[in-house]
């Protein structure tokens, strides 16, 4: 499993501003007009983890290396994207290459910033993107179904089983049900789903981009999204892109902390977003530490201790004999 999250949304919802703040770069053009991003921009960020800092102090480590997560800034989708509107097919293909989806929503009013739908309604915006992902998946699964139907004429039992699963997927998509909401799959179904790479099977979190004054507790629009996300079984994070852009310009952590304190914020919204992305990918962390460095390592959840050892060095996976738990909680 890869470790990357695609940042998606309608055009001009400040995705690129968030991406630039996340990666502390200006790699993605951010402008007040749709489709200022065409090609996806990629950047890696460290996952904030207080445990690693504590361990580095205990080990007197010279260097601290955090777990890394890749974010991909993908151009905005519009109605009809699944039919090619606004270069939609290209952008949907970019999303298909990611492991999880971070859906950025505009949750603030500002007459100086245009909205492609000409009004601020985040739930409507969610439904627009969801519809395009569903339609793209349905087109993809129908192609797979036609291909399997031809092969099934040979009487191959395995092909027939695959065809049954594909038909089940298609029926859910036709009902308007994202695949991630449907859990009645057996192990073989899960494997086929994984290989099918459905957009709506990817884990998802909503990011509510609010005005500066609402960064601490959100606003009426973000609360609508929080309610929707809870019913949807998805996560929700409140962020002010304007604040995050300012923080990214500060050099020292002390300056950042002081700035956050003046705004009544305990931490940067992007830290919450990074952790949410990490959680979406179903990852776990383990640590190594010594005088030279303290490092966080990343593994898929339910990995074994030998697999973890193999991340450090391939020989360790073959020769690991024993592992003990820490004597103090982290």
Regions found by a protein language model. Give the residues of each.
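Canonical P-loop GTPase G-domain recognition
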Residues: 213-287
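Conserved C-terminal guanine-recognition region of P-loop GTPase G domains, centered on the G4
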Residues: 88-238, 243-244
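N-terminal cationic and glycine-rich segments that engage phosphates or anionic surfaces
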Residues: 194-198, 308-312, 316, 328
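Short hinge/gating elements
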Residues: 75-77, 115, 123-129, 149-155, ...
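Conserved G1/Walker A P-loop phosphate-binding module
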Residues: 1-85, 89-95, 101-103
